[in-house]
Structures are given as structure tokens and as C-alpha cells.
């Protein structure tokens, strides 16, 4: 079953020249977001640019959120990652979806109009309520932190 999410088209090229975000396969977790820029753009090494996607969403359900994640090929092959690492879209946000692109490579990266540059994934949300305690019940891990469980 698919959950309906409200989507507003902010750039008229979405739905005409470029498709609406959609799952590529039945097993896809994310939908591609596109660079809805006005002209070809070059992102210099070390530079971060905020890229419009041409859409806005309203998740509405407080039990859901959306996350904007990088596309693995862009990061691995070209050093293009998200400037904020993960974009979190709260259920009550209704503004435009923007992607912060950071070129962490040492070569300029050219972004063309409509290029797929990130993916949108919907995730369940649990709002926690803290319970103050003086001590925790013991666990196998205890206070073991970074590197505690090893690599093998």
C-alpha cells in the first residue's frame, strides 16, 4: 500500500519535460530528485550550491518524515555529496525542496538542467519522551563507544 503525500509543482518543466519523482523499480526505496536549474552549472572543488528541485511536498502525517539522501554514483564517481549530509523534511514543512550539493573532489563538476542529483525517501518517525533516571540497567555493551565492537 502506498501512502499519499501532497506534492506541489513549482517548476512547470516537472511533469512535462521531466517526470514527477517516482520509484524506478518495485524494490526502490527512494525517488530521484532533479536539478531544476535555469542553465548548466559548474560546482567548483570545495564549493557548495543550493539546487532547486522544482517541487514542494507536505507529508502531513506526524508519523512520517522525508529524508533527502545522496545518489551513490555521484558521491563515489564525482565526489558530489550533500552539503548537509542528510536533508530532513519534517511532516509539517510545506516549502520547496532544495538540495545542498557539495563538491568534495578536486575537479569541477558540471550539473545539467534536469540531472538526477539526490533521492527522496520516506521514513517512519517515533517521537520520544525522555524518562529521567539516575542509572541505566546494565547491558552487554555498557559504555563501550567508538570502535568498541571491532571490525572483525
Swiss-Prot record:
Reaction(s) catalysed by this chain, per the record, are: dUTP + H2O = dUMP + diphosphate + H(+)
Single Gene Ontology MF annotation: dUTP diphosphatase activity
Q: List the disulfide bonds.
A: none
UniProt keywords (A-Z) are:
Hydrolase, Magnesium, Metal-binding, Nucleotide metabolism
Which co-factor is required? Mg(2+)
Pathway membership: Pyrimidine metabolism; dUMP biosynthesis; dUMP from dCTP (dUTP route): step 2/2
Quote the SUPFAM superfamilies the UniProt record gives. Answer: dUTPase-like
EC number(s) recorded for this UniProt protein: 3.6.1.23
| Role | This enzyme is involved in nucleotide metabolism: it produces dUMP, the immediate precursor of thymidine nucleotides and it decreases the intracellular concentration of dUTP so that uracil cannot be incorporated into DNA.
Task: Write down what this protein is called.
Answer: Deoxyuridine 5'-triphosphate nucleotidohydrolase
